[in-house]
């Protein structure tokens, strides 16, 4: 399998022939963090790379440091206007003028296919060997769904990413 979720470590491991892409869940499976991308690693606990045990602590442990946490956490898909002052992955504005968005983790699914991206250029899975991880995230205030797609073409040593946003 190209994609594995370790329930005990809350880590998703996506592997090709030569690379690993590791994504972690933090703070009681609330936040999706980028852990590692690089040379293939196997069976290692890389959660320490999320640095959630260091100050500023995760919001469930210290609510006063919420903004500091957002500004330092290696978010896989960062929000906007909630304390993370780095370049954000998403920017929205509602009719009421709300613009703060913080997608948090809801669930995941792993499929044995590459989803199509209508109207967009994308890789194809003619041999039907690709595997896709879908991380379902949601901003409850804006009622905004953010689905993160990661497709692994293990034999081609390629991982593709895309995002689908809906409200």
PLM segments and residue spans:
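N-terminal accessory beta-strand-rich subdomains and adjacent acidic, glycine-rich linkers
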Residues: 1-167
């Amino acid at each position: 399998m190209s994609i594995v979720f370790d329930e005990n470590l809350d880590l998703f491991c996506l592997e090709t022939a030569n690379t690993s892409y590791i994504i972690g869940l933090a703070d009681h499976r609330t936040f999706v963090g980028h852990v590692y991308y690089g040379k293939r690693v196997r069976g290692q606990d890389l959660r320490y790379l999320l640095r959630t045990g260091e100050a500023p602590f995760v919001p469930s442990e210290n609510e006063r440091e919420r903004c500091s946490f957002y500004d330092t956490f290696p978010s896989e898909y960062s929000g906007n206007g909630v304390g993370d002052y780095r370049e954000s992955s998403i920017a929205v504005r509602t009719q009421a003028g709300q613009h703060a968005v913080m997608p948090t983790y809801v669930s995941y699914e792993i499929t044995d296919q590459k989803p199509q991206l209508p109207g967009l250029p994308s890789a194809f899975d003619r041999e039907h060997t690709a595997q896709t991880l879908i991380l379902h995230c949601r901003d409850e205030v804006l009622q905004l769904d953010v689905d993160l797609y990661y497709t692994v073409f293990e034999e081609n040593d390629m991982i593709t990413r895309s995002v689908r946003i809906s409200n």
